């Protein structure tokens, strides 16, 4: 059955092999003339069909590379080399089969992502019954936010959700490229597409199927697979010169020898399979390699653009920095202990939605300080929170808000990039908690790597205040800073940056316009910044800036492989054509040799799958040294 499907998949190969067999039988029974006519009619039909395809390509704006194959088939028929003509047909159709095989191999990782897309979810009938696993199956698209789902061992998590089970272990390799299992605890988010471990778990749906992480990845992969624009453009650049060289060599051989057969013998070695097949295979391999590394490039055009990048611009908050405040110091007032101040503040901040509150709670948990429940709590928007804990009134917030309730409040001296939350207990100032948005530990290494790898200009484009932006930029090695920008100003600056192409990296909704305006927009998509991801050309699925290095390195490796495979094919073809001009390579032998050239270039193009080494070594600064550059701190948004 498989053999029959292959015959139907490649009908031209099947018909050509049958034509070969029939011509061979006719030769055996001394009917060479009939065999000649059958071969001639068959090849002529293929020529007509190929010409129709060429016209369609030209109408779509692409150069018809098959012109050399058509001329070669016509020339071999004209001089009576009908066996060579059949071999050329077999070579072209075989080249398409090789392209199909190599393309399937190259897009294997992309296809794996699509094939693993979750389709069914188990919705629990009675979520309140911890002992009951009775559930009904629904399509993933029908899961509603808040549904409690059962995920059995080794099943794929269908939608993004909050883990309700005490602990679970998940394989997130399809999302992040991390091969080791990852442990998640109750209350933590589990992304769709992760594979559950050896025990059943429960989770509450945070997002619908369409909005979940894996389904967004699938949409991006579909978009990447459907794009072939750069491959065609890359081949078109070589098509006309290669065609001209081949025709000149063939015409010269005919003119010097006076033998029209020599024209056909040269053109047989000029078929353009390295251009038609090797380059597309290399680009597909690059897209697949990137996807496996947690980087989705939306089209092949991006692979070529990112390979040639000469300028890079970065947003600050959430891109160069971690985008979340971390506690850097506790300054207790006289009579208060640092841990006591932090514990009371964190307990009160359980009832606040402010960004600083999360950093304070995280710091308390990291120090092993239990959060206590409040008898009552209220939050004053943009100012702070008040809670009654163990009979004590705890107030946390802005200095003016806390001072209105505790007149002895003392403002803390803040360093560049620091923000403070002030704490009062029972009307007395208890201390200040200093927080900062720390730079990503890999940010300096990424900037250094780009500078060392032919990126001539690195800039920061941010809406943050200049003093903070310049402090971060200085510590990360970025010399050009544009601060206090509105989105339209970011777009204008991205359009003006030279040299080009320009790469822009951002993560937030306000970055979407500038990501769309840049030559290559890269979105840090791990946190679900949908608008930025939609506008970007590249989406990084892992919360790591080091993946920018992966994207550039894979793009350059892929383009290098594509160009090298093209030049290998062209070099071998031109060399063989020069030899054929002397009459040393008959048409039939030339057609067979050219098939080997095609195979060699395709095998070389598959090197794009291996790719360069991924990521920056921990602690690397881009120069091979072990030290990590100093970490900058930037202010978290104030209350």
Language-model regions: role of each:
Residues 1-15:
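N-terminal membrane topogenic signal
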Residues 2-6, 25-26, 51-59, 71-79, ...:
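Membrane-embedded alpha-helical bundles of multi-pass transporters
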Residues 40-44, 93, 241, 262-280, ...:
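Small-residue-enriched core segments of transmembrane alpha-helices in multipass membrane transport
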Residues 55-59, 98-111, 281-300, 606-621:
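Juxtamembrane helix-loop transition segments at the membrane interface in multi-pass membrane proteins
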Residues 114-211, 301-345, 386-389, 478, ...:
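Conserved cytosolic catalytic loops of P-type ATPases
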């Amino acid at each position: 059955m498989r053999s029959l499907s292959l015959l139907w998949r490649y009908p031209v190969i099947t018909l050509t092999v049958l034509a070969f067999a029939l011509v061979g039988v006719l030769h055996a029974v001394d009917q060479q003339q009939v065999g000649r006519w059958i071969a001639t009619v068959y090849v002529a039909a293929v020529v007509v069909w190929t010409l129709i395809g060429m016209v369609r390509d030209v109408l779509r704006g692409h150069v018809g590379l098959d012109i050399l194959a058509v001329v070669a088939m016509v020339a071999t028929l004209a001089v009576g080399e009908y066996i060579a003509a059949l071999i050329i047909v077999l070579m072209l159709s075989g080249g398409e089969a090789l392209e199909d095989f190599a393309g399937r191999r190259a897009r294997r990782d992309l296809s794996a992502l699509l094939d693993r897309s979750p389709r069914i979810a188990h919705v629990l009938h009675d979520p309140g019954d911890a002992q009951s696993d009775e559930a009904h199956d629904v399509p993933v698209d029908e899961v509603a936010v808040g549904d409690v789902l059962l995920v059995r061992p080794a099943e794929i998590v269908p939608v993004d959700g909050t883990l309700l089970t005490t602990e679970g272990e998940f394989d997130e390799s399809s999302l992040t490229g991390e091969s080791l299992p990852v442990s998640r605890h109750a209350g933590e988010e589990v992304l769709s597409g992760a594979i559950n471990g050896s025990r059943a778990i429960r989770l509450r749906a945070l997002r619908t199927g369409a909005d979940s992480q894996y389904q967004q990845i699938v949409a991006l992969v579909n978009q990447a697979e459907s794009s072939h624009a750069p491959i065609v453009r890359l081949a078109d650049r070589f098509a006309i010169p290669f065609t001209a060289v081949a025709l000149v060599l063939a015409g010269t051989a005919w003119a010097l020898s006076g033998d029209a057969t020599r024209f056909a013998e040269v053109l047989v070695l000029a078929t353009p399979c390295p251009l038609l097949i090797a380059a597309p295979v290399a680009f597909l391999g690059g897209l697949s390699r990137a996807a496996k590394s947690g980087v989705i490039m939306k089209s092949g055009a991006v692979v070529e653009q990112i390979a040639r990048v000469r300028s890079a611009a970065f947003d600050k908050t959430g891109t160069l920095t971690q985008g979340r405040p971390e506690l850097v110091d506790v300054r207790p007032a006289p009579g208060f202990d640092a841990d006591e101040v932090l514990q009371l503040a964190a307990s009160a901040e359980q009832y606040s939605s402010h960004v600083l509150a999360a950093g304070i709670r995280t710091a308390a948990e990291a120090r092993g300080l239990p959060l206590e429940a409040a008898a009552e709590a209220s939050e004053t928007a943009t100012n702070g929170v008040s809670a009654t804990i163990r009979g004590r009134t705890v107030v946390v917030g802005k200095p003016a808000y806390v001072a209105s309730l505790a007149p002895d409040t003392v403002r803390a001296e803040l360093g560049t990039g620091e923000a403070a939350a002030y704490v009062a207990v029972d009307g007395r100032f208890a201390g200040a908690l200093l927080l900062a948005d720390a730079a990503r530990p890999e940010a300096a290494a990424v900037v250094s790597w780009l500078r060392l790898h032919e990126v001539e200009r690195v800039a920061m484009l941010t809406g943050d205040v200049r003093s903070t932006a310049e402090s971060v930029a200085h510590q990360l090695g970025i010399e050009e800073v544009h601060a206090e920008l509105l989105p339209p100003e970011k777009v204008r600056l991205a359009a003006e940056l030279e040299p080009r192409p320009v790469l822009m990296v951002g993560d937030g909704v306000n970055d979407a316009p500038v990501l769309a305006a840049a030559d290559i927009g890269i979105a840090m998509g791990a946190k679900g910044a949908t608008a930025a991801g939609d506008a970007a050309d590249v989406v990084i699925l892992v919360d790591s800036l080091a993946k920018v290095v992966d994207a550039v390195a894979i793009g350059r490796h892929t383009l290098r492989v594509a160009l090298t495979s093209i030049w290998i094919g062209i070099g071998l073809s031109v060399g063989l054509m020069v030899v054929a001009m002397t009459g040393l390579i008959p048409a039939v032998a030339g057609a067979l040799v050219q098939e080997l050239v095609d195979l060699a270039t395709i095998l070389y193009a598959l090197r794009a799958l291996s790719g360069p080494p991924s990521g920056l070594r921990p602690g690397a600064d881009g120069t091979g040294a072990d030290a990590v550059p100093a970490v900058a701190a930037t202010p978290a948004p104030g209350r």
